[in-house]
Curated annotation (Swiss-Prot):
Span list, region Aspartate: 200-203
GO biological process: aspartyl-tRNA aminoacylation
UniProt cross-references to PROSITE patterns, sorted A to Z: AA_TRNA_LIGASE_II (PS50862)
Organism field: Listeria monocytogenes serotype 4a (strain HCC23)
Name of the molecule in the record: Aspartate--tRNA ligase
CDD domains: AspRS_core, EcAspRS_like_N
Reactions mediated catalytically: tRNA(Asp) + L-aspartate + ATP = L-aspartyl-tRNA(Asp) + AMP + diphosphate
Annotated ATP binding sites: R222, D223, E224, Q231, E484, G536, L537, D538, R539
Record's keyword terms, sorted: Aminoacyl-tRNA synthetase, ATP-binding, Cytoplasm, Ligase, Nucleotide-binding, Protein biosynthesis
Catalytic EC class: ligase
Protein family (similarity comment): Belongs to the class-II aminoacyl-tRNA synthetase family. Type 1 subfamily.
SUPFAM superfamilies per UniProt: Class II aaRS and biotin synthetases, GAD domain-like, Nucleic acid-binding proteins
Encoding gene, per UniProt annotation: aspS
C-alpha cells in the first residue's frame, strides 16, 4: 500500500500540479458520458476525483465497479477546476484530482442510511450502526473538537504544574447520591467493588499525600435516571489542589475554559466570569444553573397582590408561600387561550397547581383574573412589572421551591419559543454561596447539596450540631448557557469537622467509620487545606458543538434507557460465570 501524501480535505490551490496519494471512502460516484467522478472522503473532508479514459483507461474501468463506502487508494495529480465547476460548498471545491491509479482495498454493503449530514434516521439505528454514523462529517467534527478541548485542558494543567495521577476504577461503594454500578468479587464471594461516581475521596487523599496539584481526565459511572444531558458513564476533567483559596481555584478554572473556547471555537471570552449567589439565582431565575443569555426574570409580586381578592394568591401567601411573575415583553399576541392552557399543563409537570395570566391591552389588564384587580391595584402591578401594552404576565403562586421550579422551567421554554436566545453566545457564570444541605422530600431528611466532604463556611461550623439547615458551604458551580458544567468546593480537612458533618447527615459514629474509616484515619495525619473542581467534558463539548444531547459527544454512548444497541449491552452472562462469582439471578415472573 502506497503511503498517503495528503488527507482529502487538506487539498487546495497550493497543491495544484502535485502528485498525491489518497486513502478514503467513496462518498458518491457519478458516471457522466465516459467520465467518472468520485467524491472521496476521509476524516479531514471530501475531494472530487476525476477518472478520464484519455489519462488512464485502466483506472476508469476499476472506478466503474466501485460503489458508495468502498475503501480505496487513489493516486493522481491535483488540477484546478474550471471556473464553472468550482464548488463553494466544499473546502476543496477549487481543485480536483485527476486519477492515474485506483486500488480497491475493501468493498461495502449498502449502508442502512446515507453517510451524510442531516440524514433523517432514528437514534436507535444511528447507535446500532454507530461506526457508520461516526463517518458523517458533522460527527467527525465533534470528535475533532473533543480532542482539541481535551488536549487544551491537559496542556494548561501541565503548564500549571498539575500531576496527572490515575485513581482506581474498582473501589468501595460509598453513598454519594446516585446508585453505584457494582462489580462482584470472585475472590471474596458476596462482596462487591463499585465503579466510581467520582474520584472525590481518593483525590483528597492525594492531597494528604502531599502531591499539591492533581488532575485526571477520568471516566465516572452513575446508575441514575437518564435524560438528554446525562449518560451512565461520562468523563470529568477532575482537579484538586492544596493551599489555594476558592478564588484562586476559580481563576485557574476560568483560565482553562477561556483557552478551551479560544482553541475550539476561536472565540475570546472575557474574565473574570460573572458571579451570582445561589439565593440570587433562585430568586431571579428559578434555577441554580441559570441561562443568563436572555431576560424574562422572575419578579416577586407577593406584596403587590397580597390584598387582591384572588384566593389562589391569598392562600399561597397565607401559607408561607409567594407569588412571582414573568413579564414576557410584547408577547401577548403570540399566545392564544389554547396556548396559555398548554403552558399551564407544562408548569404542572414541575408541581404548579396552575398558571395565572394577564395581558396588557390599551393600558388595561385583560384575562381571567383581571376582575380581581381594581384600578389602583392594576396600576401597582403594572408598575412593579414595568408592564406595557402588548406584554404577557404569567404568575405562579405556591411554596417558594415550586414557584421557582415551575417558573424557572417556563422561563427557559419561553426563551426558546420566543427566539430570545443568541445561540452563538457563550455565557459563563459562577454560582456561589450554596447551602451545605438540601431537604430530600422522599427521604424526609436533609442531604448533602454537593457531597459530604464539602467545607462549611467557618462561621457556620458550630451550626452542624444545632441547626444544619442554616449552614452555608464553601462551594461553587460553573454554569454555561443554562447547563451546570462543573462543581467544586473547598473540602473538609479536619477530622472533628468531618465527624460533625456525618452526624448532621444522620450517620452514627459506627456507620461513618464503616463507610469512611480510611478517610477519617487520613485526616489525623496532617491533611492540608485543599479544594478543587470537576468539569464535565462531555457536556462542555456538547455545548461548544451546538448539540443538545450528550450522545453526540460520546463515541459509543447508551440510549436513554441505558442500553447500547451496538453491542446489545447489558446482556445475560453464562451460568458458569455466575457460579464462579457465587451469584444467582432472580427473574421476575411475567403474566
Amino acid at each position: 500500500m502506497e503511503k498517503r501524501t495528503s488527507y482529502c480535505g487538506e487539498l487546495n490551490e497550493a497543491h495544484i500540479g502535485q502528485s498525491v496519494v489518497l486513502h478514503g471512502w467513496v462518498q458518491k460516484r457519478r458516471d457522466l458520458g465516459g467520465l467518472i467522478f468520485i467524491d472521496l472522503r476521509d476524516r479531514e473532508g471530501i475531494v472530487q476525483v476525476v477518472f478520464n479514459p484519455e489519462f488512464s483507461k485502466e483506472a476508469l474501468e476499476i472506478a466503474d465497479s466501485v460503489r458508495n463506502e468502498f475503501v480505496v487508494t487513489i493516486k493522481g495529480t491535483v488540477h484546478a477546476r474550471g471556473e464553472k465547476a468550482i464548488n463553494e460548498k466544499l473546502a476543496t471545491g477549487k481543485v480536483e484530482v485527476l486519477a492515474e491509479e485506483i486500488t480497491i482495498l475493501n468493498t461495502s454493503k449498502t449502508p442502512p442510511f446515507y453517510i451524510e449530514d442531516g440524514v433523517n434516521v432514528s437514534d436507535e439505528l444511528r447507535l446500532k450502526y454507530r461506526y457508520l454514523d461516526l463517518r458523517r462529517p458533522e460527527m467527525n467534527n465533534i470528535f475533532k473538537m473533543r480532542h482539541t478541548v481535551t488536549r487544551t485542558f491537559r496542556n494548561k494543567l501541565d503548564a500549571l504544574g498539575f500531576f496527572d495521577i490515575e485513581t482506581p476504577y474498582l473501589t468501595k461503594s460509598t453513598p454519594e447520591g446516585a446508585r453505584d454500578y457494582l462489580v462482584p468479587s470472585r475472590v471474596y464471594p458476596g462482596n462487591f467493588y463499585a465503579l466510581p461516581q467520582s474520584p472525590q475521596i481518593l483525590k483528597q487523599l492525594l492531597m494528604t499525600a502531599g502531591f499539591d496539584k492533581y488532575y485526571q481526565i477520568v471516566r465516572c459511572f452513575r446508575d441514575e435516571d437518564l435524560r438528554g444531558d446525562r449518560q451512565p458513564e461520562f468523563t470529568q476533567i477532575d482537579l484538586e489542589t492544596s493551599f489555594l483559596t476558592k478564588e484562586e481555584i476559580q481563576a485557574i478554572t476560568e483560565d482553562m475554559l477561556v483557552d478551551v473556547v479560544k482553541e475550539a471555537k476561536n472565540i475570546t471570552i472575557d474574565k473574570p466570569f460573572p458571579r451570582m449567589t445561589y439565593k440570587e439565582a433562585m430568586d431571579r431565575f428559578g434555577s441554580d444553573k441559570p441561562d443568563i443569555r436572555f431576560g424574562l426574570e422572575l419578579q416577586n409580586v407577593s406584596d403587590v397582590v397580597k390584598d387582591v381578592d384572588f384566593k389562589v394568591f391569598q392562600s399561597a401567601i397565607e401559607n408561607g408561600g409567594e407569588v412571582k411573575a414573568i413579564n414576557a415583553k410584547s408577547a401577548a399576541a403570540n399566545f392564544s387561550r389554547k396556548d396559555l392552557d398548554a403552558l399551564g399543563v407544562f408548569v404542572a409537570n414541575y408541581g404548579a397547581k396552575g398558571l395565572a395570566w394577564l395581558k396588557v391591552e390599551a393600558s388595561e389588564l385583560k384575562g381571567p383574573i383581571a376582575k380581581f384587580f381594581p384600578e389602583d391595584k392594576a396600576a401597582d402591578l403594572k408598575a412593579a412589572l414595568q408592564a406595557e401594552d402588548g406584554d404577557l404576565l404569567l404568575f405562579a403562586a405556591d411554596k417558594a421551591d415550586i414557584v421557582a421550579a415551575s417558573l424557572g422551567a417556563l422561563r427557559n421554554k419561553l426563551g426558546k419559543d420566543l427566539n430570545l436566545i443568541n445561540e452563538e453566545e457563550l455565557a459563563f457564570l459562577w454560582v456561589t454561596d450554596w447551602p451545605l444541605f438540601e431537604y430530600d422530600e422522599e427521604a424526609g431528611r436533609y442531604v448533602s447539596a454537593h457531597h459530604p466532604f464539602t467545607l462549611p463556611k467557618e462561621e457556620d461550623i458550630p451550626l452542624l450540631e444545632t441547626d444544619s439547615s442554616k449552614v452555608m458551604a464553601e462551594a461553587y458551580d460553573i454554569v454555561l448557557n443554562g447547563y451546570e458544567i462543573g462543581g467544586g468546593s473547598l473540602r473538609i480537612y479536619k477530622k472533628e469537622v468531618q465527624e460533625s458533618m456525618f452526624r448532621a447527615l444522620g450517620f452514627t459514629d459506627e456507620s461513618a467509620k464503616e463507610q469512611f474509616g480510611f478517610l477519617m484515619d487520613a485526616l489525623e495525619y496532617g491533611t492540608p487545606p485543599h479544594g478543587g473542581i470537576a468539569l464535565g467534558l462531555d457536556r462542555i463539548v456538547m455545548i461548544l458543538a451546538g448539540r443538545n444531547n450528550l450522545r453526540d459527544t460520546i463515541a459509543f454512548p447508551k440510549t436513554g434507557s441505558a442500553v447500547d444497541p451496538l453491542t446489545n449491552a447489558p446482556g445475560e452472562v453464562s451460568a458458569a460465570q455466575l457460579a464462579e462469582l457465587k451469584l444467582e439471578t432472580v427473574k421476575k415472573e411475567t403474566n
